[in-house]
């Protein structure tokens, strides 16, 4: 099982971000940690009663927002409380996101003492002009300093988040960003193409013509360069946007793509939990508003969460949607075990059609996207959807 905690506090909201994150709310951090621990205890009690044993967490992920904004004493209280409530595996992968502009040794001390053994830093870009366009508060020298601090504290499993297809970004600038990231010797890189989200300042500037995106050919070249350059440096692609040195693929991410049950705590956090011996999964989502979440916890008004059972058809499609994002692909044997029916019976005709189009390949009992299929993944999934 996997555990996710959402820490929605930010020093400044990035211009492209549509996540549940809030600037200027630092005064609520203590109350928020109280709420997280209360929710953790309640969920642990419920599922321990349902399963007859405590929840064992194989991975833990602190996301945001900016978890590194949490004061060290609050981080210590949170992580200590989680260990009291859950059975966290001794070899658990324990990741925290961090912003290079907010990281300091005291926070890292508390993180390591609480079990954090993997750090994901939001570098995003190398060039100051692009960081300004994104509304980031750091520069590359702060990324370098953060990496040094993390290693000095004993965290050597380091991931960097990068973004391509940005307004004003050229292919040469993207290569420069990759080179800068690689100079820091990370174990993992996440390389995301920008998706301008409605309601964000960046999307408004694009719609107004103030900013413009690279053309499709340039963005494709950026992705091709990512595959070539990272492979040359020993990185293995294990998902469309994720690359790792051997042995350093993110276990938390892999669990999500393989439909491992996960428990989410905090504002906007989602869970997908087994309610009846693998035959009835339920997805629930907490309210996204910070104060709405705190109010829910204070009043114990759990009905403000959205809760929906995952139908068998949804579960089948999610196996394809999530599995095809990975380079491993979708296993015919695993599909049969999970859903009690053959992949060929459910999707055979459509899979073979996509294979004939050069978008899927079939080998060793797995269906995988081809390189061309990665470019049109959404079209592949539309073909696989039920009519």
Show the residue positions of the predicted features.
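C-terminal scaffold of the Radical SAM
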Residues: 1, 21-47, 55-341
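Immediate flanking context of iron-sulfur cluster ligation sites
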Residues: 1-7
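Local cysteine-cluster metal-coordination motifs and their immediate loop/turn environment
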Residues: 8-21
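Short amphipathic alpha-helical interaction segments
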Residues: 341-353
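A short, conserved structural fragment
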Residues: 355-365
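Minor-groove-contacting beta-hairpin "wing" of winged helix-turn-helix DNA-binding domains
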Residues: 366-370
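Short, amphipathic alpha-helical interaction segments positioned at domain boundaries
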Residues: 372-387
